[in-house]
Amino acid sequence: MDQQKIPQATAKRLPLYYRFIQNLSLSGKQRVSSAELSEAVKVDSATIRRDFSYFGALGKKGYGYNVNYLLSFFRETLDQDDITRVALIGVGNLGTAFLHYNFTKNNNTKIEMAFDVSEEKVGTEIGGIPVYHLDELEERLSTDIQVAILTVPATVAQSVADRLAETNVHGILNFTPARLNVSENIRIHHIDLAVELQTLVYFLKNYPQ
């Protein structure tokens, strides 16, 4: 099936399914029901079945889903055998945490380099990742770097995004409050932690469990 027709909400849930199925496989489990998946990932069973239906017959009624088959399917669908190389721009507290973490649970995603303007950080390694001066951004970003993580001050986020647009980067994970304007060939995911926290507090107050 043409993955362009898969709803974005479904696409966002695929890595969640994949991680749980990975854990099932490691535990030696051979099959799983949509109800078990629902309980584990906190997505209702009907939504899971609908998500899976976009990819054809992944399971059998009365049997559930074969764990190894799902693992193989999602690995291919999510391109888990291809390495995604990432650059991080902004080595403050959040950026430093990313460098130490470096997606240890995702073997196909690696931060290769970082950029900052601090004299104390430029020329060092954090979590084994070299930190370069921001002035070297275009020079250092190779054609292999496809994704950038932005953890810079909001005041400079747009100017950095403009520079990234001149490189081979096609995806930006933006952790700044700034809403960025870039060309259509670059996809941006905005993650504003303050907004997420405010949303959580609102739901706690207005939708008590």
Swiss-Prot record:
Cited SMART domains: CoA_binding
Molecular functions per Gene Ontology: DNA binding; DNA-binding transcription factor activity
Keyword Nucleotidyltransferase attributed: no
Protein's GO biological process: negative regulation of DNA-templated transcription; response to redox state
Superkingdom of the source species: Bacteria
Keyword annotations: Cytoplasm, DNA-binding, NAD, Repressor, Transcription, Transcription regulation
Entry keyword annotation includes Cytoplasm: yes
Pfam families referenced in this protein's UniProt entry, alphabetically: CoA_binding (PF02629), Put_DNA-bind_N (PF06971)
Annotated positions binding NAD(+): 90-95
Major location (coarse): cytoplasm
NCBIfam families per the UniProt record, alphabetical: PRK05472.1-3, PRK05472.1-5, PRK05472.2-3, PRK05472.2-4, PRK05472.2-5
HAMAP family: Rex (MF_01131)
Subunit and partners: Homodimer.
Protein name: Redox-sensing transcriptional repressor Rex
Organism whose genome encodes this protein: Bacillus mycoides (strain KBAB4)
